[in-house]
Every structure is written in C-alpha cells, then in structure tokens.
Amino acid sequence: MGEIIKGKPVADKISEDLIQEIEGLKGKGIQPKLAIVRVGANSSDLAYEKGALGRSKKVGVETEVHELPEDITQDDFIKELKKLNEDKAVNGILIFRPLPEQLDESVIKYVIAPEKDIDCLSPINVGKMTEGDKTGFPPCTPTAVVEILKFYGVELQGKDCAIIGASMVVGKPAALLLLNENATISVCHIFTKDSAKIASQADVVVVGVGVPRLVKENWIANGAVVIDVGINVDKEGNMCGDVDFDGVKDKVSMITPVPGGVGSVTTSILAKHVVKACKQQNNL
C-alpha cells in the first residue's frame, strides 16, 4: 500500500513558522488581520469559515467576518468591499465564492485591492501567478497542493503531471504553479478525449473536479503520487474524494486522504498569505 500523506503535518509546520513570524511583527507593533466577506449563510462557506477562523486564531492573525444579506445589491456589495480596501488595519480580504447571481464577479474582481486579494480573485494576481511573480497571491487550494508535494519530498522538476479538472479554483492555477516548478503539465477537462490514458502516464496526478471517485485504478500508473482535492458526499452519506481511494491505494507511492488531506493545508496557506500581505504593505 502507498504512503497516505496527510495534510496535518504540513499545516502544523506552516503554523509553527507563522507563529514565530507574527510574534516578530507584533514586536514591531504590527498585527496581521484578515477580513472574511460572506454573502448569506451557505453551509460550505460556513464550514470553511470555521476552519479559517480557527487556524487564524491559532497562529495569531486577527479576523473579522462581514456577513452580508443574500439579496445585497451589487452597488452595496462594492461599497462594503471598498471600505475594506481602504481600511489600513485590514491586510487580507477573502470573498467566499461563488457569489449570488445578482453580484457580477467579472466586475467585483477589478474592485478588490490586489495587495489584499489573498485568494487570487483579482486579474492582477492571476497575471502574477502566470509570470511566476512571487509578490502575488495564487489561490490557496492549489498552493496547498504544491506545499504538500514539497513537504513530502516529491521531486517536481522534469516530472510529468496530469491535472484532472480545469477550473480557475483548482485546475488552471495548479497547472501554472506546477509549471513554475519546472514540471511538464497535461490538463484534462470535460472535452479531453482520453483523460484516463493521459493520467496513467503521469508521475503526479492532481484531481479537482467534484465528481465522487471518478478516478479509478486504471487512471493511475504504478508508483504515481496522487493529490485528491475533491470533497464530496456519496450516496451513502460518506465523505469521499474525486479518487477511488480504495481502488488505487495499493498502486500509488503516495496519496492524500479525504478528509484529512488538502483541506487542512488550505487554511494554513490562507493565514500565510495574510502575513505575506501584511509584510508587503509594511514594506518588510
């Protein structure tokens, strides 16, 4: 059986480093602060919020939650966002997405201050990620994927990586971040002719499509490393990933579990990005 690579040790190491970094900032009279913007009370937003607040508290990042009504108008939403842009005490802004249909993300993404946009909504941060500019903020989840691979000593340079899923949340940014590590990337999506064949030739497979147990044993090469970003609930009510864990676990060299894999690292990356934003805003 392959090694089950859990997220907790990765998250704990990031948290340890952040605690020391934040102590140093506090010694200079600087307090990192995160503002969470949530429209309505979607259960998955609330679950992520709980994790983000817990992780922030653990490392010493201050937080404030702005819960806005489900039917808020675009003008009112933009007013609230601009207030946070201008609030010098706030270093990072996280907007839960997708937003309700009356709010136009294609407009809002140009409103958020890029220097506070810690989860890559702004096109400026998308551009920085594309260039490999380290001053930007790539999305937290694909950043967590790369952190896990590095933590467990997975060599990426020159390796073949298959990304299953091409969303702006996971697939596309994961492809760019792994490309920046000098891996060779194949991205599979709904129109890909034979995703299983492409995946089965890869050294590293990253899956983020939101389909329970889509990736079966025949998709995975012997000794491959598999990172499962999916979080689903199956027909029996059990939480599972996008990979058929039981079917592939004896074939892989490493695999992340669901739950207990990527998700726990994502909130640590969020806190890390708040601290990075805080330091950049204070020219440190």
Curated annotation (Swiss-Prot):
Keyword Nucleotide-binding listed: no
GO MF terms, alphabetically ordered: methenyltetrahydrofolate cyclohydrolase activity; methylenetetrahydrofolate dehydrogenase (NADP+) activity
Lineage, uppermost ranks: Bacteria, Bacillati, Bacillota, Clostridia, Peptostreptococcales
HAMAP family in alphabetical order: THF_DHG_CYH (MF_01576)
Keyword Amino-acid biosynthesis: yes
Pathway: One-carbon metabolism; tetrahydrofolate interconversion
UniProt: NADP(+) binding residues: G165, A166, S167, I190, I231
One Gene Ontology biological process: purine nucleotide biosynthetic process
Function: Catalyzes the oxidation of 5,10-methylenetetrahydrofolate to 5,10-methenyltetrahydrofolate and then the hydrolysis of 5,10-methenyltetrahydrofolate to 10-formyltetrahydrofolate.
Subunit annotation: Homodimer.
Reactions the enzyme catalyzes: (6R)-5,10-methylene-5,6,7,8-tetrahydrofolate + NADP(+) = (6R)-5,10-methenyltetrahydrofolate + NADPH; (6R)-5,10-methenyltetrahydrofolate + H2O = (6R)-10-formyltetrahydrofolate + H(+)
Full protein name: Bifunctional protein FolD
Keyword terms, alphabetized: Amino-acid biosynthesis, Histidine biosynthesis, Hydrolase, Methionine biosynthesis, Multifunctional enzyme, NADP, One-carbon metabolism, Oxidoreductase, Purine biosynthesis
A Gene Ontology term for the protein's cellular component: cytosol
Record-linked SUPFAM superfamilies: Aminoacid dehydrogenase-like, N-terminal domain, NAD(P)-binding Rossmann-fold domains
Record CDD domains: NAD_bind_m-THF_DH_Cyclohyd
Family, per entry: Belongs to the tetrahydrofolate dehydrogenase/cyclohydrolase family.
EC numbers: 1.5.1.5, 3.5.4.9
Cysteine pairs bridged by disulfides in the record: none
InterPro entries: Aminoacid_DH-like_N_sf, NAD(P)-bd_dom_sf, THF_DH/CycHdrlase, THF_DH/CycHdrlase_cat_dom, THF_DH/CycHdrlase_NAD-bd_dom
Domain of life: Bacteria
